[in-house]
């Protein structure tokens, strides 16, 4: 009887412990920390890869005000980002998108293979083991001071072969989780982590998705799913709606809001392509942000043949009218699908 009583007591204690473990929380190092909720926007943000100082000029030229500023930032530069976030805040911008690249940038002219070669200190395994902890911690602290939402697009397009962080999906996942743990430890609760792939439309859908899944760090470490949407022309000329199937695959799989993290098109046929993009977006309320990028493209520079990407929407009346419509469409409340509601990445995580 005594043994039976002890067994019952053990079972009761086990049930209590397991029940406690179901309370939403995050394991950060050796302690549990709750993640504050960030609201999912019911409008679609529009970002421009520009310094905040030039956002107003862009808005005046295009006739629509971006709601988000975006930039690329490489680990090797070890720069402060407070000037970027503080200027955005001063100009009334409450969201920023940062494409955060764990490497020392390689000159484009050296080619893809040189660019993709692993760099000591910046390799996924090095980051997972703490090689960049001091920098990551400082960067997280700077972003935590921003009175708005930071969309952090870490180590993007990992499912390609042109960046050094594409090597070893397992170590990529480890590096990502380690980075997120540091941000949570610092208390940067205003940061949303954006896992952003390349659509690789030259691949068949199933192997493309299976390859991308290898890099997935886990639902507890991702808030939004992103994808590049660039029509280079030449051998890579794709209508906007060609990207839709890839985006829907990602949304069905992960049930998270989508962000088009880099959007651009060749000069030839640009108006038709942009109209197609607008039509696609009107059918996809799960897309919560679009980031317009007309920065010099490594992809265009390193392709055997790409059409003209060196044009500026600010100076092109025909295309800027469509871009203006896309921006204004997003300012209207977007209908939330049941999938989007169920996909809320703002729920506390385990």
Residue ranges of predicted features:
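Acidic (Asp/Glu)-rich catalytic clusters
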Residues: 57-64, 80-98, 105, 139-147, ...
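Distinct, well-ordered alpha-helical segments
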Residues: 201-220, 270-277
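Substrate-binding cleft of secreted/luminal carbohydrate-active enzymes
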Residues: 34, 38-52, 261-349
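Aromatic- and acid-rich polysaccharide-binding/catalytic face
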Residues: 64-74, 212-238, 293-295
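Boundary/entry segment of secreted carbohydrate-active catalytic domains
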Residues: 28-77, 345
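Aromatic-lined carbohydrate-recognition surfaces of secreted/lumenal glycan-active proteins
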Residues: 183-209, 255-268, 289-292
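Substrate-binding cleft of extracellular glycoside hydrolase catalytic domains
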Residues: 80-195, 292-293, 309-314, 323, ...
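Glycoside hydrolase catalytic-domain groove-lining segments
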Residues: 84-101, 221, 227-269
């Amino acid at each position: 009887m005594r043994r039976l009583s002890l067994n019952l007591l053990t079972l009761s204690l086990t049930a209590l412990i397991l029940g406690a473990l179901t309370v939403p929380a995050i394991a950060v190092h050796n302690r549990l920390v709750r993640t504050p909720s960030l609201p999912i926007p019911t409008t679609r943000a529009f970002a421009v890869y520009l310094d905040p100082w030039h956002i107003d000029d862009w808005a005046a030229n295009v006739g629509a005000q971006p709601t988000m500023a975006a930039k690329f930032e490489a680990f090797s530069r070890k720069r402060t980002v407070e000037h970027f976030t503080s200027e955005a805040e001063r100009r009334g911008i409450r969201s920023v998108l940062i494409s955060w690249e764990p490497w020392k940038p390689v000159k484009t002219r050296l080619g893809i293979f040189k660019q993709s070669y692993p760099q000591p200190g910046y390799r996924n395994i090095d980051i997972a083991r703490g090689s960049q902890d001091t920098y990551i911690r400082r960067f997280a602290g700077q972003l935590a001071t921003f009175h708005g939402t930071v969309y952090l697009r870490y180590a993007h397009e990992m499912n390609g072969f042109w960046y050094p962080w594409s090597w070893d999906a397992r170590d990529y996942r480890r590096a990502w989780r380690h980075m997120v743990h540091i941000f949570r430890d610092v208390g940067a609760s205003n940061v949303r982590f954006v896992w952003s792939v390349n659509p690789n439309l030259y691949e068949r859908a199933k192997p493309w998705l299976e390859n991308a899944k290898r890099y997935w760090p886990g639902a507890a470490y991702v808030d939004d799913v992103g994808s590049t949407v660039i029509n280079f022309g030449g051998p890579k000329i794709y209508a906007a709606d060609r990207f839709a199937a890839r985006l829907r695959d990602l949304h069905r799989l992960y049930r998270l809001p989508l962000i088009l993290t880099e959007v651009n098109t060749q000069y030839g046929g640009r108006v038709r392509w942009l109209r197609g993009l607008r039509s696609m977006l009107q059918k996809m309320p799960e897309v919560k942000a679009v980031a317009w990028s007309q920065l010099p493209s490594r992809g265009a520079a390193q392709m055997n043949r790409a059409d003209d990407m060196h044009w500026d929407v600010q100076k092109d009346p025909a295309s800027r009218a469509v871009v203006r419509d896309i921006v204004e469409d997003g300012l209207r409340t977007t209908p939330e699908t049941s999938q989007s509601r169920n996909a809320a990445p703002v729920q506390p995580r385990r």
